[in-house]
A protein has these predicted regions:
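Flexible loop/turn segments at secondary-structure boundaries
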Residues: 35, 98-99, 129, 202, ...
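Secondary-structure transition/capping motifs at alpha-helix termini
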Residues: 143-144, 169, 303-307, 325-332, ...
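A conserved beta-strand->alpha-helix junction
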Residues: 152-153, 157-162, 331-342, 437-457
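Short, glycine/charge-rich flexible loops or terminal/linker lids adjacent to PRPP-binding catalytic cores
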Residues: 328-373, 384, 411-421
Length: 505
């Protein structure tokens, strides 16, 4: 079936998407600047964090305009659409769905009218008390006898509705800033939020700081973004990270900050492994250097006699460089990646499906033939890609294929913004390392240890969420039935008060 952006919903390797992050967020307050174009370039730098939909909201001081659609940033926006978004405040979002289906209604920024004007909001992360938030929306004061309606089926629209609908004890509507101090302490999970009303840009980060969020300075304004790389691309200088549990407001009076919860840092270690751009810094540590160091430590923990080290491009390259450096085995390019293939633009026949990984990667036979190969990758989720890769390298003449992974086995699902499979689908959950190697057809398989990976980040272990590797989640989780990606679609089909809140007017 065609998607909203004209592409087709057909993966080349069914069931093997790899780790997918929730989203990328960007916000700017800069009078006199072309804030829509700055946001466009910021989202372009964050495209790796979400490819399903993109949107930008802009305020000129009196009204907020929102433009969003399905597709990549470059597919959604052009000169005409960007030119129509005039103002001095902007919020942008690039989405990959972790709660709610991939449909236009769930594209962000979300938008909602308030008693004082309106609000637009973008969210990176995933919430774990979505069912509770839906009940809270159902309990909001009724307007003209009608309950608050939520058109989307994602956790972000629930937060937007809560921020827009708060009142004090006398029933007087609260401002967005007042509402944020009341609502955010009740929101559980991972959230890096960028939101706005007509005159103010806001940003907030969950008390654990699970997803990254940074503050930057322009000559005539301020920028907030998921990653420092997005600051670089729009010419902003890095100021600091938004602290866990912090709310920042930026308007004509300057920047003000407040704390809505105590900071209990638990940054996602998988940002260092795979999710973030290599040219991003997180908590003062460069991601590329962390990945190279993971490769070095992997080589010391899992040496092997071989002729050549290659990477699964592009995410495995830094670790492969480190592995080659520490092992003394030459690093080379053995696989050529087609940068333009993600999902197919045609209906795949069975023949096309059998091509699978070859449409994404092609081996350099002259480099591979007769060689004992070390193939370095960042992670294994289900194993389909690595299995196809080993087969391809064998056919290209590799004498031996040794797989080395710069993260530990992924054994637990993520509920905080990475679309990992259910635990039953994770290959490392039901098989030993040797069994996985055999299933892939590899001569050997080794993973880096958890401690070595964490040491490579230079971040203290207690300050990192590593739940996908060790099952130690940074907060209490509700019943698994209340954590599904399609939770709100399921809720909508029911007959509860929360379902009434979710139905469209």
């Amino acid at each position: 079936m065609p998607r909203g952006d004209g592409r087709l919903n057909h993966d080349l390797l069914p069931g093997e998407k790899g780790p997918q992050d929730a989203c990328g967020v960007f916000g700017v307050w800069a009078p006199g600047e072309e804030v829509a174009k700055l946001t466009y370039f910021g989202l372009y730098a964050l495209q790796h964090r979400g490819q399903e939909s993109a949107g930008i909201a802009v305020s000129n001081g009196s009204q907020i305009l929102v433009f969003k659609d399905m597709g990549l940033v470059s597919q959604v926006f052009d000169e005409t659409s960007l030119g129509s978004l005039q103002g001095h405040i902007a919020v942008g979002h690039a989405r990959y769905s972790t709660t709610g289906a991939s449909v236009w209604e769930n594209a962000q920024p979300t938008f909602r009218a308030t008693a004082h004007g309106s609000i637009a909001l973008g969210h990176n992360g995933n919430l774990v008390n979505t069912a509770e938030l839906a009940e809270m929306v159902a309990d909001l004061p009724r307007q003209d006898g009608r309950a608050t309606q939520v058109a989307a089926t994602n956790d972000t629209d629930l937060v937007t509705a809560l921020l827009a609908g708060q009142t004090d004890e006398d029933g007087k509507p609260l401002t967005i800033e007042e509402s944020a101090t009341k609502v955010l302490p009740k929101v559980k999970g991972a959230f890096s939020l960028v939101f706005m009303d007509e005159g103010t840009l806001y940003t907030a980060r969950d008390p654990q700081g699970i997803r990254p969020l940074v503050l930057g300075r322009l000559e005539r304004g301020w920028v907030v973004a998921s990653e420092t790389a997005a600051l670089d691309i729009c010419g902003a200088s890095f100021v600091r990270e938004v602290e866990p549990g912090e709310l920042i407001a930026i308007d004509e009076n300057g920047l003000r900050t407040s704390r809505f919860a105590e900071a209990k840092p638990k940054g996602c270690v998988f940002e260092y492994v795979y999710l973030a751009r290599p040219d991003t810094d997180i908590a003062g540590r460069n991601v590329y250097l962390s990945r190279v160091e993971m490769g070095r430590r992997l080589a010391k923990e899992a040496p092997v006699e071989a002729d050549l080290v290659i990477a699964t491009p592009e995410s495995g390259t830094p670790a492969a460089v480190g592995y080659a450096e520490a092992s003394g085995i030459p690093f080379g390019v053995g696989l050529v990646k087609n940068a333009y293939v993600g999902r197919t633009f045609i209906q795949p026949s069975q023949t096309i499906r059998q091509l699978g990984i070859r449409l994404k990667l092609n081996p350099l036979k002259e480099v591979i033939r007769g060689k004992r190969m070390v193939v370095v990758d960042d992670s294994i989720v289900r194993g389909n890609t690595q299995r196809a890769l080993v087969k391809m390298l064998r056919e290209a003449g590799a004498a031996e294929v040794h797989i080395r992974i710069s993260s530990p086995p992924v054994k637990w699902p993520c509920f905080f913004g990475i679309d990992f499979a259910t635990r039953a689908e994770l290959i490392a959950n039901g098989m030993t390392v040797d069994e996985i190697a055999t299933s892939m057809g590899a001569d050997s398989l080794s993973y880096i240890s958890l401690d070595a990976m964490i040491e490579a980040t230079t971040i203290q272990k207690p300050n990192l969420c590593r739940a996908c590797f060790d099952g130690e989640y940074p907060m209490a989780l509700p019943d698994p039935q209340l954590l599904g990606k399609q939770l709100l679609e399921t809720e909508l089909a029911g007959g509860t008060d929360a379902a009434d809140a979710l139905r469209r007017p």
